[in-house]
Amino acid sequence: MVEWLFEVTPNKSTRVATKRDVYWFVNRLFELNGKTTAGNNSDSLILFMRPLINNQFWIQHRNEYWLRALINQFEIFHPDNTSPFDNEFKQATGIKLTDFFVIVSYVYFGMRAENRRLNYIQIVKYLHPYYSLETIAKSIRIIAGTPTQLQDFLCNTFPREVTDTVTIAETRLLHKPILITEGYLYCADVTLLGRGIAEAALNHFVRKNTAGFRKRFGLAFEHYVNVCLSRPDISYLRETDVEAIYKGAGISGKVTDFLVTGDDGCVFVEAKGVVPRAETLCTANPYLIKRQLKDSIIKGIKQIVECAYLLDGASNQFSAVKKERFGLIVTQGEFLLKRGIDIAQDIAPHEIKSLTKKFGEPIPYNNIFVCSIQDFEYLTGIAKQQPDFLLAFLRHCCREDADPITMKMMMVQHIETFFKVLIPGDEEYTRLESRGLKDNRLFDKTIDVMSDCHAYWKGKLISTTYDKSISLQRMLQAT
């Protein structure tokens, strides 16, 4: 509703709403929502449910979930000590990508600590003079705007893609979650703030769509999936290792990015650094969904099936493929589609039929899953170890989905129940927070900047800090 305020023309004869007015409005809202979902007459329960939970499930995540998402994005964009995307980001915004991450991280921490408000004086105290006021203002304006700037952004820069799904589409305020006001920054909701900041860098690049970005991001994304797989209880081969097996067996064809091996099975892992489009999350139409998935998730399924088929021919060199097999496609965004069997039956039956005709079924589609990188990192970040960790988890998913009573809609639901099985109830089962927060490069850098700036301002006149805050406010409000 906050978003809609920037799209409607105020009535000159406004008045305080009565109970009857509110009742009428809510009924109209439900009526509109009913018309929107009436077209989702899919025989598939999964496809029918996707639009209904699209703008609901992410709001229910704890704040720590989106804090981890912010840290994950920093790690993806910084495979080394510097970011290969720094220059590209600076050409478009005038600031380095690394600096942007540090500045918005402080803004996120500060607004959470101050009940969604952050005074400009506080920003100056903890970010300046390490960063110039101009750099701070440019960074904040990527995720914030005055009421006028927000209205222009929503109507012109980022117009609504699907007008008839307004009640179920994700709010576009995710792209500008912060309001610039007199004296302070403000956000209507902490979860909106967390997700908006966590996804800000990638959203910027996706909107710009510069040449070669998707390929370079795909490589960085694959590198981070490799980082997540690096656990003592996960053994795996890289793409080059699988190609070597092909060569030794005298075969050629598609390979997966990773092949996790275990004593009694294997997992074909494919990294796809893609995010869903708004329209595919708001529809149950399989054709529209397939159109986007064709070059990402469906392509990943084809790679997994062909790789499993080809390794059958090399089984003398690689015995793990003779046993139980699973497939896992790790995506950047949440597609609200976690089972390969749903894609095979409800979205791309003709493509899968052709695939089966060519290769048979070397891996059951019930054993292929889709998982966002956020959930995958959450899973692999748990401190508790388990023999053949990833195999054990995917078997857990299959067992739960085999029974309608325990079947899950979201991968994170499987993860939570897996943790409860993995660790007794009298022990704490959370992600390894120490690795995610205290030992993270983004966290360390942000703390260092805040400490240096706080030490600089200690003992200085309050009037000096105030003058700087006024200058920052003017820069933020400038058109």
Positions of PLM-derived features:
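A solvent-exposed, charged loop/short amphipathic helix patch at secondary-structure junctions
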Residues: 276-296
